[in-house]
A protein has these predicted regions:
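A broad detector of the eukaryotic-type serine/threonine protein kinase catalytic domain
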Residues: 11-15, 48, 52, 56, ...
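Short alpha-helical
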Residues: 38, 42, 65, 115, ...
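N-terminal Rossmann-like NAD(P)+-binding subdomain of aldehyde/semialdehyde dehydrogenases
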Residues: 1-98
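Residue-level signal for inorganic ion chemistry
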Residues: 25, 70, 131, 162, ...
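Conserved small-residue-rich beta-alpha loop and adjacent elements
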Residues: 88-156, 185, 202
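Conserved NAD(P)+-binding/catalytic subdomain of aldehyde/semialdehyde dehydrogenases
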Residues: 106, 156-202
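Alpha-helical elements of the RecA-like P-loop NTPase motor core of helicases
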Residues: 45, 118, 143-147, 173, ...
């Protein structure tokens, strides 16, 4: 499906409420955790090809950090999802007030070339924990790593829930033309301004 259809399909899926329950979020985090472990060697080979990074450096700066992020989210997710009581204004007595965490909806994650695994998958962990759908756009400047991340995501998740889009500027422009509920971007100030301008239109 093209990018517009993909975002529309994710929004439709989000609107079903399927991503909201604790059990669903927990399962998806565990699936990502297992997929990352299963594909660790593939990612190491890809990063050797793109950056000449040794496996130990890949683990210390990339995959290991994402696995730690996953462990932390799996431990704390239930607490983060709880309603939190807050003070009630006197004018509203005798009612009670609560803050209830809610998902944004459909997220776009645009990652850079220099830490392409960590800065792609760590934001994805947050998107999943938050009960969102997500489109991940790995950097075209790390082609082997981008292909490996896309493979991991496609083999792990339904595209209506989590999808990967590969490509360069044309794909970035097509993604930014869509309406997303939140965008996680890591990169230069110049490109950040382009992302902010595109997001402001929605």
């Amino acid at each position: 499906m093209d990018i517009q259809e993909l975002v529309r399909a994710q929004r439709t899926y989000f609107d079903t409420g399927a991503t909201r329950p604790y059990a669903f979020r927990l399962l998806q985090l565990k699936k990502l955790q297992q997929a990352l472990r299963d594909n660790e060697q593939l990612l190491e080979q890809a990063m050797m090809q793109d950056f000449r990074k040794a496996p130990m450096e890949v683990y210390m700066c990339e995959t290991g950090m994402v696995l730690e992020e996953l462990r932390f989210h799996l431990k704390h997710l239930k607490g983060w999802m709880r309603e939190r009581a807050v003070p009630t204004p006197l004018a509203q007595f005798p009612s009670k007030s609560f803050v209830s965490p809610e998902p944004y909806g459909v997220a776009l994650i645009i990652s850079p070339w220099n830490y392409p695994v960590q800065l792609c998958l760590s934001p994805l962990v947050g998107a999943i924990s938050g009960g969102n759908c997500a489109v991940v756009k790995p950097s075209a400047y790390a082609p082997a790593t981008s292909a490996s991340i896309a493979k991991l995501i496609r083999e792990t998740f339904d595209a209506r829930y989590i999808a990967a889009v590969e490509g360069g500027r044309a794909e970035n422009s097509a993604l930014l033309a869509q309406r997303f509920d939140t965008i996680f971007f890591t990169g230069s100030v110049a490109v950040g301004k382009v992302v902010m301008e595109a997001a402001a239109k929605h």
